[in-house]
Structure formats: structure tokens, C-alpha cells
Amino acid sequence: MLKEFREFAMKGNVVDLAVGVIIGAAFGAIVSSLVGDVIMPVIGAITGGLDFSNYFIGLSKEVTATNLVDAKKQGAVLAYGSFLTVTLNFLIIAFVLFIVIRLINRIKRSEEAKPAEAPAPTKDQVLLTEIRDILKTK
């Protein structure tokens, strides 16, 4: 059973999936940094210095804090600023994956469109062609 599992785990598809998951996690971290450290500050600067990560609605009267960390300590909050940031992360990742898949499909279509070369004739076919040509000359 252990041998069977090892064979399964070492198949190309499983290894490819593992590599894809690792690269996807790294890409997710890059996109999170892009959104949190580059895009959201620019949007905040355009909108007058607003920090979207601190946008929240207190769901109880005990929540009086002005920042999200303290508000969460005081009670339940609806942190819609964090949700906006995560949604933007998702949209960027989905768009990049869409572009990558679109490019891969375009490459596949161009490869499929190329006509396949005719296979080289076998020895029998060459011999029969020579016999035919000799018979034509007689």
C-alpha cells in the first residue's frame, strides 16, 4: 500500500499540482502586497488620505474605537474595508489568470493550426514506387 501511494504521489499530475499550489500561494502574496502596499494607498491618496483597511461598522454600541484593531477588541464589527481589499486582490488574481489562460489557449490553437508534416515513406513504399516507375517506362 505504501508503494502504491508513493507511485501515486510521484505521478506527473500530482507533482504539477503541488508546484502550481506553491506558485499560486507565492503569487497571492505578491498580489496582496501590490493591493495593500501600492494600489490601496494610491486610491487612498486620490480620495483624500482615506485608509480602506480601517473602514468598519460597529455592530454594537460598545464599539467606539476609530480604528479596526481596537474596534474588534470592543465587539463585533463589519470590516467592509478589509473586504474591499480582499475583493480587489481576488479581481487582480482572476484577471491575471484569465490573461495567462487566454495566452496558453492562443498558443495551443496556433500549434493545432499548423499542418502536420507527411510521414516519410516506409521502405516498402519506396520499393513499390520504384517498381511502379520502372513499369511505367516499359
UniProtKB/Swiss-Prot annotation:
It is a multi-pass membrane protein. Its main location: membrane. One of its GO terms (molecular function) is mechanosensitive monoatomic ion channel activity. Belongs to the MscL family. The lineage of its organism: Bacteria, Pseudomonadati, Pseudomonadota, Alphaproteobacteria, Hyphomicrobiales. Homopentamer. GO terms for cellular component: plasma membrane. The chain crosses the membrane at residues 19-39, 40-60, 81-101. This is Large-conductance mechanosensitive channel. Keywords: Cell inner membrane, Cell membrane, Ion channel, Ion transport, Membrane, Transmembrane, Transmembrane helix, Transport. It comes from the Bacteria. Gene3D superfamilies: Large-conductance mechanosensitive channel, MscL, domain 1. It is found in: Cell inner membrane. Channel that opens in response to stretch forces in the membrane lipid bilayer. May participate in the regulation of osmotic pressure changes within the cell.
